[in-house]
């Protein structure tokens, strides 16, 4: 495999992953960032040579990415589809549906352990910003929402989340790297939104939860064509890696 400093995806997050999975994560980051452009044909031999691996893990990686619909497997090789603004918006559509459903279940259960867990994660997010660690902030941000999803113990909701997570995580990583360098003040808004989430769950207040969800997701939807969600922004996220 490539040296960790040459990778876009944080290598420490994949210490126990198979070679194929690690190749998939790196290729995904390159595709989402636009470093590998839509329409590019990926060759098993070329990828294997670049990553210093055999073709078997490369095939595994390409199958993973094909299942996520960001590449298409054809006879001549794997054709990159990429991540469009429409796809980003659709990911957030599904997240809004998921988290709205989950909240309806949360009001029926004991949420004290969940509130404690979310409060801890939020503190870690604050520490990450204090030390200007965009990658750790991204990890904690995804973990925050995943912890909410897991709290209702719903296997099919979890399955949908697991399918969304890889591409969504790549997008979040790249966008947070740019925010840290160019729009640091925006983290205050993000942290405030997460505080609102916790308060809504703690009080089981549906109106507050709807407010917190829409504050988070409508902000994204309204800006789908803006710099933060454009290919230019994602490419910048790749440039800012390991700065």
Swiss-Prot record:
Pfam families, alphabetically? FCD, GntR
Q: Name the DNA-binding stretches.
A: 44-63
All residue ranges annotated as the HTH gntR-type domain in the record: 17-83
The record ties this protein, via SUPFAM superfamilies, to:
GntR ligand-binding domain-like (SSF48008), Winged helix' DNA-binding domain (SSF46785)
Q: Which residues form a coiled coil?
A: none
Keyword DNA-binding in record: yes
Q: Which UniProt keywords apply?
A: DNA-binding, Gluconate utilization, Repressor, Transcription, Transcription regulation
GO MF annotations in UniProt: DNA binding; DNA-binding transcription factor activity
The answer, when asked if Hydrolase is one of the entry's keywords, is: no
GO terms for biological process, alphabetical: D-gluconate metabolic process
* Annotated function: Transcriptional repressor of the gluconate operon (gntRKPZ), which encodes the proteins for gluconate utilization. Represses mRNA synthesis by binding to the gnt operator; the binding is suppressed by gluconate or glucono-delta-lactone.
Protein's recorded name: Gluconate operon transcriptional repressor
Species lineage = Bacteria, Bacillati, Bacillota, Bacilli, Bacillales
């Amino acid at each position: 495999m490539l040296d960790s400093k040459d990778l876009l995806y944080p290598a420490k997050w994949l210490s126990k992953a198979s070679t194929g999975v690690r190749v998939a994560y790196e290729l995904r980051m390159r595709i989402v960032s636009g470093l590998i452009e839509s329409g590019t044909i990926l060759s098993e031999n070329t990828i294997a040579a670049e990553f210093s691996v055999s073709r078997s893990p490369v095939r595994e990686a390409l199958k993973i990415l094909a299942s996520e619909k960001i590449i298409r497997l054809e006879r001549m090789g794997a054709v990159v589809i990429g991540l469009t603004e429409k796809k980003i918006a659709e990911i957030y559509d599904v997240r809004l549906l998921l988290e709205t459903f989950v909240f309806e279940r949360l009001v029926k259960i004991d949420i004290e352990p969940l509130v404690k867990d979310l409060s801890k994660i939020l503190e870690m997010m604050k520490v990450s910003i204090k030390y200007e660690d965009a990658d750790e902030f991204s990890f904690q941000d995804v973990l925050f929402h995943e912890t909410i999803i897991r709290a209702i113990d719903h296997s099919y909701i979890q399955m949908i989340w697991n399918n969304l997570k890889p591409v969504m995580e790549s997008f979040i990583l790249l966008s947070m790297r740019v925010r840290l360098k160019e729009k640091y003040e925006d983290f205050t808004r993000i942290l405030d939104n997460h505080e609102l989430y916790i308060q809504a769950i703690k009080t089981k207040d549906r109106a507050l939860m709807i407010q917190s969800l829409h504050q988070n997701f409508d902000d994204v939807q309204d800006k789908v064509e803006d710099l933060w969600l454009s290919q230019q922004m994602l490419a910048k996220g790749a440039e800012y890696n390991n700065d």
